[in-house]
Amino acid sequence: MPELPEVEVSRMGISPHMIGQTIKAFVFRTPKLRWDIPQKLKKLEGQVIRNISRRAKYLLIETDEGTAIVHLGMSGSLRVLDADFPPAKHDHVDLKLTNGKILRYNDPRRFGAWLWSAPNEPHAVLGHMGPEPLTEEFNADYVAEKAKGKRVAIKQFIMDNKIVVGVGNIYANESLFKSRIHPTRPAGKLTKKEWQLLVENIKATLEIAIQQGGTTLKDFAQADGKPGYFAQELLVYGKAGEPCPECGEALQEQKIGQRNTFFCGVCQK
C-alpha cells in the first residue's frame, strides 16, 4: 500500500512535467474506483495546473477552477507518458495535457480514488487530520500531550490520522524498532525522552524513504516506472522469524489494530 513517502515521491516525480501546463481532457476507463469518479473533474479541462501538493496520502492537482484529488489506495501508481502511449490493463484514468503528455493512473485493485473539490472548499476527506509528520508542528511536546491517559497501543496511536497523518504500517514498524519501543505499549506510558526519540525516528525514517524513492513491495512504481528502493533498508517489516539485526533473536509478528506488526521481543520494551 502506498504510504506517505510513496505519495510524496509521486508528487515530486510528476510535478516538473505538469505544473504550468494546461489540462486538455480527462479519460475515464471505469466509472468507479473506491468511489464513483465525479464528472465534475471535467470542469478542470482547459485550466492551467498551478500547483501539485500533498496532504497526508492525498495528491492535490490545483487549478483556479478547482482541484483534482488523487488517492493511490492499495495498489495505485501514476506515470507521465507520451499521449500516444497505449493503455495497459488497469490503466483507469488519463489526465491529458496540451503539451502532448498524459498523467496515467494505474490501479489493479481499484481501491484508490479520484475526487474533485471546488476552489477554496476543502474536500471532506481532508478534514479532521493531524499535522504532517515532517513539520515542526509534529514534535515530542505535541504527541506527549495528545497521549496523556491513552491506553491504546503506541503503534495504533501513531497511525491515527487525527494524531499525525501519513505514518503508515511499514514506517510505524520501522520507527518503533529504531526507538526500541514495543508496539503494544500504551501510548500514555511513554516517557518524554521516548517520545523525543520516536518522533526523531519517524521523521528520519520517512525522509530516508523519500530519498530512496519509497518502498516497492508489489505494485508501487515511481512516476518514471522505476521501483522504490527503501525495501532494501527495512529492518523488521515483513521479516518475522528472521534474526533481529541488533540481538539475533527471531523477530516476531502479531496483529495490532488489524495490521501485521513486526518487532523484536528482546530489544523493544
Curated annotation (Swiss-Prot):
Q: Where are the zinc fingers (FPG-type)?
A: 235-269
Q: Which InterPro entries match?
A: DNA_glyclase/AP_lyase_DNA-bd (IPR015886), DNA_glyclase_Znf_dom_DNA_BS (IPR015887), Formamido-pyr_DNA_Glyclase (IPR020629), FPG_cat (IPR012319), MutM-like_N-ter (IPR035937), Ribosomal_uS13-like_H2TH (IPR010979), Znf_DNA_glyclase/AP_lyase (IPR000214), Znf_FPG/IleRS (IPR010663)
**Does the UniProt entry include the keyword Hydrolase?**
yes
Keyword Secreted attributed: no
For this UniProt record, the keywords arranged alphabetically read as follows: DNA damage, DNA repair, DNA-binding, Glycosidase, Hydrolase, Lyase, Metal-binding, Multifunctional enzyme, Zinc, Zinc-finger
Annotated disulfide bonds: none
Catalytic positions?
Answer: 2-3, 57, 259
State which Enzyme Commission number(s) the record gives: 3.2.2.23, 4.2.99.18
Biological process GO annotation list?
A: base-excision repair
Show the catalytic activity.
Answer: Hydrolysis of DNA containing ring-opened 7-methylguanine residues, releasing 2,6-diamino-4-hydroxy-5-(N-methyl)formamidopyrimidine; 2'-deoxyribonucleotide-(2'-deoxyribose 5'-phosphate)-2'-deoxyribonucleotide-DNA = a 3'-end 2'-deoxyribonucleotide-(2,3-dehydro-2,3-deoxyribose 5'-phosphate)-DNA + a 5'-end 5'-phospho-2'-deoxyribonucleoside-DNA + H(+)
What interactions and quaternary structure are annotated? Monomer.
HAMAP family given in the database record = Fapy_DNA_glycosyl (MF_00103)
- Official protein name in the record: Formamidopyrimidine-DNA glycosylase
State the taxonomy lineage: Bacteria, Pseudomonadati, Pseudomonadota, Gammaproteobacteria, Vibrionales
